[in-house]
Amino acid sequence: MSLLQFSGLFVVWLLCTLFIATLTWFEFRRVRFNFNVFFSLLFLLTFFFGFPLTSVLVFRFDVGVAPPEILLQALLSAGCFYAVYYVTYKTRLRKRTTDVPRRPLFTMNRVETNLTWVILMGIALVSVGIFFMHNGFLLFRLNSYSQIFSSEVSGVALKRFFYFFIPAMLVVYFLRQDSKAWLFFLVSTVAFGLLTYMIVGGTRANIIIAFAIFLFIGIIRGWISLWMLAAAGVLGIVGMFWLALKRYGMNVSGDEAFYTFLYLTRDTFSPWENLALLLQNYDNIDFQGLAPIVRDFYVFIPSWLWPGRPSMVLNSANYFTWEVLNNHSGLAISPTLIGSLVVMGGALFIPLGAIVVGLIIKWFDWLYELGNRETNRYKAAILHSFCFGAIFNMIVLAREGLDSFVSRVVFFIVVFGACLMIAKLLYWLFESAGLIHKRTKSSLRTQVEG
């Protein structure tokens, strides 16, 4: 890449970054937080944060990258995607009407809400316990990170339930919403994330997500400033780099450490070059249609229920890894959101995907606002826990693609909804057995006086 080519790319990168950052800033000033703000920051991180890192790798360490015209296509496709997404998100689908009282879809009380978070936490802890009994601490047993996907590790399906510890702790926080509950959320979820990091053998997702949710709650409540958020972001990048070194068993120093920091940080937070690699091989892609979305559900079907289930699932990430990169190391390489759309239907699917994503984020913001307006604090805690708990799925959406997002968000909704139903069933059984006694003002006054 020549200096002139880099200058052209830099101008395009700067314009796209300023465009998205400006719209995000105006939205932040208007509402302080919603899921449009979160997705916009996530989109910036995924598709634009990596460009400066790539530039340093090219000019400082002479690392080979895709041709400049392909990198330009990647930047422009990301910028155009966001423009279509933003217009879709801001488009009003129906006329604004005065709030008419409607019959609520469901209600929650204190016992049902507490039962819900206990069940969610129980699912996570039991899953971790069973996985640990089968495999022990994989971080200290395996020689390479790719081995966690091998036949040496049993009970891999249990890892999908670990994440429900975070929604459980979110319910606990939203029931109190004070600084002590906020700090308790951070300590409990990060501690759980570190435990799963050691047990699973290097998975950092629970730690990243817990820390991100903690920061956004702090921003919403005004407990941290933007400068503190930026400092925490830098600390998070350094922390993730250190965990990555431990995961891959690397011991580096000097220039090698700087080089390793650049490419690991780029691959962890901003795999935008993967989109460029897909575009570089555009003519060789056999468009998969909507099949990757259907195939991604295969991993949630037990083999005893479907004996002939394919052992290898050809979703967009695996198609990119196996067919485009010809990489059979055992790791699936993230194609990014736009990359997954390219795999499914080429350039035509990019604006269509942007419209779909705009509607998805719009739905989450509608649900979030519903929680903000809810007068029943227990129902509000459940709604907010569901919305913030889905942040993991939005990260999957930006990094892994639309197919991975759809299967995971459906799984999340099913498990979360099942926990709600079980909590309500248990409450009904306890109440029928006479074990539930409603609190009265007189009993509360007696407790206080006593």
From Swiss-Prot:
Keyword set includes Transmembrane: yes
Pathways per UniProt: Bacterial outer membrane biogenesis; enterobacterial common antigen biosynthesis
Parts of the chain that traverse the membrane: 6-26, 37-57, 63-83, 118-138, 155-175, 181-201, 207-227, 228-248, 341-361, 378-398, 410-430
GO biological process: enterobacterial common antigen biosynthetic process
Compartment(s) of residence: Cell inner membrane
GO cellular component: plasma membrane
Membrane topology (UniProt): Multi-pass membrane protein
Pfam families recorded: WzyE
Subunit annotation: Probably part of a complex composed of WzxE, WzyE and WzzE.
Family: Belongs to the WzyE family.
Function in brief: Probably involved in the polymerization of enterobacterial common antigen (ECA) trisaccharide repeat units.
Name of the featured protein: Probable ECA polymerase
Native source species: Escherichia fergusonii (strain ATCC 35469 / DSM 13698 / CCUG 18766 / IAM 14443 / JCM 21226 / LMG 7866 / NBRC 102419 / NCTC 12128 / CDC 0568-73)
